[in-house]
Amino acid sequence: MLAYYVRLALKSFRRTPGITALMIGAIALGISACIVTLTVYHAMAGNPIWWKNDVLYAVTLDSRDPPQPGASDVNGPPDQLSYADATYLYGSSIPRRKAIMITATGALSGAPGHSGAVLVHFRATSAGFFRMFDVPFEYGGPWNAAADQGPEPVIVLSRQENDKLFGGTDSVGRSILFDNHPFRIVGVLDQWNPQPTFYDMSQRSFGNASEAYVPFAWDAQLHIWPAGHMSCWGDADPHTYPQLIGANCVWILLWAELPDAASREHFQAYMDAYWAQQHKMGRFQRPRDNRLWPVDRWLTRHHVVTDNSKLLLRLAFAFLAVCLINTVGIELTKFLRAAPLTGVRRALGASRGHIFLQHLVETALIALIGSAIGLALSWAELDAIQALYAGSKDAYGLLAHFDPLGVLWALALAALATLIAGLYPAWRIGRVPPALHLKSQ
């Protein structure tokens, strides 16, 4: 019977091609809008390292001056730490791994076939960064902990930077000039650009990963001025690197890998003891607010999913609902126009259930075709967004890629909604008395 109902549906399509195309087009537009919006929203709202959510913690202290009378501070401690606080906490042996970091700009030169210097955004960090955040390598690997102490002149390149400087070949072991100092390449990253950039959201929640990585201690050796966010208070106004490391300024990020509750409690106590010591010395005059942020709470703190994104998602589903309502109206009109044929089938012995199933199969075919076209449209729209924002750091260009799980959910939801919306027209045509249309024949 199913094959018979499919043949009847195809005949119906040929009888009313314009109306059928209109219904399919409405469904396709609604589904494509939902898929594109839900894909971007799902990427924004996702935790890019969910499997380590209860292991990785952002470390914050509040070393700022007391707030002015009457002022309120609902945001909690700043994301970053001062040089003294960050280096002290980094020296703890409690975490399994730890990562201290800043971002800055530097120049790479000396690569074969490149006469001039290439300006890069690099990250001065520690060896733990790569293993903590599961950073993949195409060639080589990270430097070891001993290289952090020296520091040794070692560097890790991103895949894109290695492609640019060495044509994508294995450059491990080669030398390159970093700010006119010879550095040895120890590793080249594979494709890695998690969104949101959970490990560093001091400036923005979405963006491109760093192009090169060097041991954090080179920051002090070369007096590298940070390019990331910096916040100072009091009379702090540093103009040189020695002034910066002693100033009341926060500009360094610190993460700790704490695998169990015992290590978390131990490190929290370590932070609290440090706070008490500094408080006695005249620092940390605000109420104690030492925090360890798991990744999911860190993302929530930074409002990664904005109210505008939520509103856009609601509008996309509202648009789909409007498309479906219009489709129901058009479909009901189409079925009622074919009521004389339905009356003949009823007179020949077809039951109301058979009529209902016949029109439900037709609705399902329309939903299937509309969903397929909507999927193709959404693919084209996501490609267009990527092309539009190619080369920019805009979040939409980075997030507009096909996420199979998000697309599957959106497609299944839209197709199911279309099928449910078609229940009423199919039921309504089955309730039409056949005698009325037989008399008109």
Regions found by a protein language model. Give the residues of each.
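Intracellular coupling helices
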Residues: 6-18, 325-361, 365-366, 431-440
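C-terminal membrane-exit region of the final transmembrane helix in multipass inner-membrane proteins
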Residues: 406-441
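Short acidic/polar micro-motifs at solvent-exposed secondary-structure junctions
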Residues: 62-79, 99-128, 142-155, 177, ...
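Mid-to-C-terminal secondary-structure elements
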Residues: 128-142, 153-302
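Membrane-helix entry/capping segments
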Residues: 1-6, 11, 15, 19, ...
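Short, strongly hydrophobic transmembrane alpha-helices
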Residues: 15-50
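Membrane-proximal extracellular/periplasmic loop immediately following the first transmembrane helix
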Residues: 37-110, 116, 248-253
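Transmembrane alpha-helical interface segments in multi-pass membrane proteins
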Residues: 325, 341-386, 409, 413-417, ...
